[in-house]
A protein has these predicted regions:
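A short, conserved alpha-helix within the catalytic core of class I
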Residues: 126-138
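Short glycine-dipeptide loop
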Residues: 143-149
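Conserved beta-strand/loop positions that form the S-adenosyl-L-methionine
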Residues: 54
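A short acidic, Gly/Pro-enriched loop at the edge of an enzyme's catalytic core
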Residues: 108-117
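Class I S-adenosylmethionine-dependent transferase superfamily signal
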Residues: 65, 138-139
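A short beta-strand submotif of the Rossmann-like class I SAM-dependent methyltransferase core
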Residues: 119-122
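Class I (Rossmann-like) S-adenosyl-L-methionine-dependent methyltransferase catalytic domain
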Residues: 1-46, 57-106, 129-130, 149-230
């Protein structure tokens, strides 16, 4: 278990308290639609099912998912109180529930609730392996058996960046003095992610490395898909 009262999470909560941007420019990323959300193209397969966006920001991904499938519900969870209050007001007519999490797990979410979980431009901002593992382990709990987790992280060589230092995948850098690209984690090889997800309990894990999009902090991104066992 990760202590909720740790330096990194406290810094994140302060940084994100009032909210973030909605990043509409990332809707123009073809890989967003053709890789991250590619499984949703078979829209009939998701009718009356339930999805979640982890680190949902101001609701862009939730709105996008609602627009392409006839879901029962698409929820959002985020560390920012400002973002969640914005979404509760702005999307009050949508088929969505919104949750503000504590930064180290998603304990307010039900077991075996979601058929599909996505996350983008989020996990790469957390240079603390123990926190990412705690979050991903808890997201697995909330997936239904056979459910899919599709996410993206920064990928490339070295730890240098024009935006600030990067940390390696298994590093625990609790004392980062900034988030949201100021001190990201960088995946150096696909096997780190695959092995980690297997150890957490996921199966049928696939990855795809592509050039990054509107992200000067990473030359490439890695897209990952992993399933909860049936």
């Amino acid at each position: 278990m990760v202590n909720k009262d740790n330096n990194y999470t406290n810094m994140q909560k302060t940084s994100y308290h009032n909210g973030t941007g909605n990043h509409p420019e990332h809707n123009d990323n073809e890989d967003y639609w053709n890789i991250l959300l590619s499984d949703l193209k078979d829209s009939d397969n998701w009718s009356n099912k339930i999805a979640l966006d982890f680190a949902s920001g101001k609701g862009r991904n939730v709105s996008n998912m609602l627009s392409i499938c006839n879901w029962n519900r698409v929820d959002g969870v985020d560390i920012s109180e400002g973002n969640i209050e914005f979404c509760k007001t702005w999307y009050n007519a949508k088929l969505s529930d919104w949750y503000c999490n504590n930064g180290v797990d998603v304990s307010d979410l039900k077991d075996n609730e979601y058929d599909f979980i996505m996350s983008t431009i989020a996990l790469q901002h957390i240079p603390v392996y123990d926190i990412r593992k705690s979050l991903i382990t808890d997201l697995l709990r909330t997936l239904k058996p056979g459910g899919l987790f599709s996410f993206q992280m920064g990928f490339g060589e070295g730890l240098e960046s024009p935006l600030g230092p990067r940390s390696a995948y298994y590093t625990n850098f609790y004392d980062a003095n900034g988030t949201n690209s100021h001190h990201d984690v960088r995946v150096h090889n696909e096997s780190d992610v695959i092995d980690d997800l297997k150890n957490i309990g996921f199966v049928n894990i696939t990855t795809e490395v592509r050039e990054s999009y509107s992200d000067s902090g990473h030359t490439h991104w890695i897209y990952v898909k992993a399933y909860k066992p049936q």
